[in-house]
Structure formats: structure tokens, C-alpha cells
Regions:
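Active-site core segments that coordinate phosphate-bearing ligands/cofactors
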Residues: 1-193
Length: 193
């Protein structure tokens, strides 16, 4: 899941279950100088690379705990954007995305995702996305709904929508262009770990 990096950072590194409190000091969205490659379990999309690993990049003596927390949130959002770009390159027009589960409870992360992807983010009522997806496919397979789109409209209840802010989306576009350079630069090193 996308939020597994957030959970790892909060629980294993920061030693807290209160990730919301760790996000509170984050003030300057789109202006962080630290990047995080969120490939803690390798990467599957769009870089099919089981050797890829997580990396913090750009830290200095001025880097704070909040900067690193923000980098984790942004890194996962940038990786989601990578997949969005693949869809766009195939001619698929995407104007909004849907999120659910634990990560969807963070107002800050929802805002980051909306601005990094520069599309609307619909938050679903359901907690377990894979279970909902399985139920939707089963319902289509059994003929309850004619297709996945119809099943989604009936079963995936939207409880909140977060829209990108033009100023923040522009800042995140610049940061995303830098993020895209990191994986190709690191790829040769991953195999040597």
C-alpha cells in the first residue's frame, strides 16, 4: 500500500503511532529540499525493479525531522505521479483519483497528493481498498453490475474531495521534475547493495 512508507517512517524510525502529530510542524509545502525515494520493498510501477530501495536525498545540517517526514509524504505522492504519467502517455485522460485507508485520513497528505498529481482527490468511505476492488470485480463477474465503472459508482462512496491549488501544484511540478531524475541516477547502485 502507498501508506506503508508512512507507517514505516512513523513507527520504525520515529517510534510513534501518532503520525498526525509528526505532520503538524510541516509548514512549507512544495519548498522542501529533501527528497525520498519510497522504494522500501523494491518498485513495481512504473519501474519494475525489485532491487530499488528507499533513499533520502538532499539532506544538510539544516534538515529537520519535519523536513524528512514531509519528504516521505511527498516521495510516495511523486511515485504515484510516476504511474499517472504512464497512463497519460497511453492517452488516458485522468482528472481525478480516489484514495482510501489509513493514509486517506491525513488532511496534509491528501493535499500533497492533489497538488503533486494536479488532479482532484476523492476520499472514499471504505477503509480497505483491495477488498472493495475484489467485491467490485466479483459483482461484475456475477452480473450484478455490467462493468467496473458502474460498480465503482455504486459501491465507492466519496466522502471528501481535495482539489489542487494552482500555486502549490506549480511548486510541486518543479519538485517532481527533480524527483524523476533520482531513480535513473540511483538505479545502477541498487544492484550493488
Amino acid at each position: 500500500s502507498a501508506a506503508s512508507c508512512n507507517k514505516w517512517w512513523a513507527e520504525e524510525i520515529l517510534g510513534t503511532k501518532d503520525f498526525a502529530a509528526e505532520q503538524a510542524p510541516i509548514q512549507k509545502l512544495g519548498e522542501n529540499h529533501v527528497f525520498f525515494l519510497p522504494y522500501l520493498m523494491g518498485e513495481r510501477s512504473p519501474h519494475n525493479d525489485p532491487d530499488a530501495r528507499g533513499v533520502f536525498f538532499g539532506m544538510s545540517m539544516d534538515t529537520s525531522r519535519a523536513d524528512m517526514t514531509q519528504a516521505v509524504l511527498e516521495g510516495v505522492a511523486f511515485a504515484l505521479r510516476d504511474s499517472l504519467e504512464v497512463a497519460k502517455s497511453l492517452g488516458i485522460k485522468i482528472e481525478r483519483t480516489k484514495i482510501c485507508g489509513g493514509g486517506a485520513k491525513s488532511p496534509l497528505w491528501k493535499q500533497i497528493i492533489a497538488n503533486v498529481m494536479n488532479i482532484k482527490v476523492d476520499v472514499l468511505e471504505v477503509e480497505e481498498g483491495p477488498s472493495l476492488g475484489g467485491a467490485m470485480l466479483a459483482a461484475v463477474g456475477c452480473g450484478v453490475y455490467p462493468d467496473v465503472e458502474t460498480a465503482g459508482k455504486k459501491l465507492a462512496k466519496v466522502v471528501d474531495t481535495v482539489e489542487p491549488t494552482p500555486e502549490l501544484a506549480a511548486k510541486y511540478e518543479e519538485r517532481y521534475q527533480k524527483f524523476k531524475e533520482l531513480y535513473p541516477a540511483m538505479k545502477p547502485l541498487f544492484k550493488n547493495l
